[in-house]
Design a protein with these regions (language model features):
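Hydrophobic, well-ordered beta-alpha structural blocks that scaffold small-molecule cofactor pockets
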Residues: 3-12, 16-171, 179-181, 188-213
Length: 213
């Protein structure tokens, strides 16, 4: 079976969309789907769908019936969420955005386990966020040395993200989910960064509404 590392970034970016749609099919009691039907929903071609599935594992459709929805979901869940191994995750920044993101992490079955939250504001220290007590950022080194988190969620301004990301890499962080309103990059090829810009889709919506024929 091919591993996720062998899939290109564009393929990886499409996997969550496949997953969401297949979940809706399963909820509706649909057991199989053709590459052509999937392509229509994904806005791509049947050939591209087949190429994507060749990248992620032993995914084979049947003549006349297509792909098994259950089998596709099982493969995608293993790739996207792991096989029960939820990644230990810490949150940096416990303002309104941090609180909202923490609720998503702790309530959605997404392969991550929030184990700590940090903030620079002494007024936030000791409060709870999604059932976790907020720590001061000065405790970062000692906590990471003991608990070995793998992922950091950044809900801080740009200057804060730039300052803390280097510290976090030195402490063993392997992945960043970055909400700091700019594209974070780290000079380490083995560290994965996902930059999230919540306003991008809103700007796209505005453009499309204002520029319709």
């Amino acid at each position: 079976m091919n591993t996720p590392a062998r899939a290109s970034l564009p393929v990886i970016k499409r996997l969550p969309k496949y997953y969401r749609y297949l979940c809706s099919l399963q909820a509706d009691g649909i057991n199989s789907i053709s590459s052509r039907e999937l392509a229509a929903q994904m806005g791509t071609t049947a050939s591209q769908v087949r190429q994507d599935f060749n990248c992620i594992g032993d995914v084979k459709g049947r003549q006349g019936s297509g792909y098994s929805v259950e089998n596709l979901l099982s493969i995608l869940e293993g790739l996207l969420f792991g096989n029960g191994d939820r990644l230990p995750t810490i949150l940096i920044g416990c303002g309104r955005l941090g609180k909202a993101v923490s609720r998503f992490i702790t309530t959605d079955t997404n392969g991550y386990r929030l184990i700590a939250a940090f903030d620079v504001a002494q007024s936030e220290v000791g409060k709870e966020i999604s059932g976790i007590q907020i720590r001061h950022i000065d405790e970062l080194e000692s906590f990471c040395a003991e608990h070995h988190p793998k992922v950091a969620v950044l809900c801080v301004p740009r200057d804060g993200a730039e300052q803390v990301s280097g510290r976090l890499v030195d402490l063993g962080i392997e992945g960043f989910w970055n909400f700091s309103h700019y594209d974070l990059s780290v000079p380490y090829p083995d560290v994965v960064v996902e930059n999230v810009h919540l306003g991008d889709s809103l700007m796209s919506l505005g453009y499309r509404l204002r520029n319709q024929d």
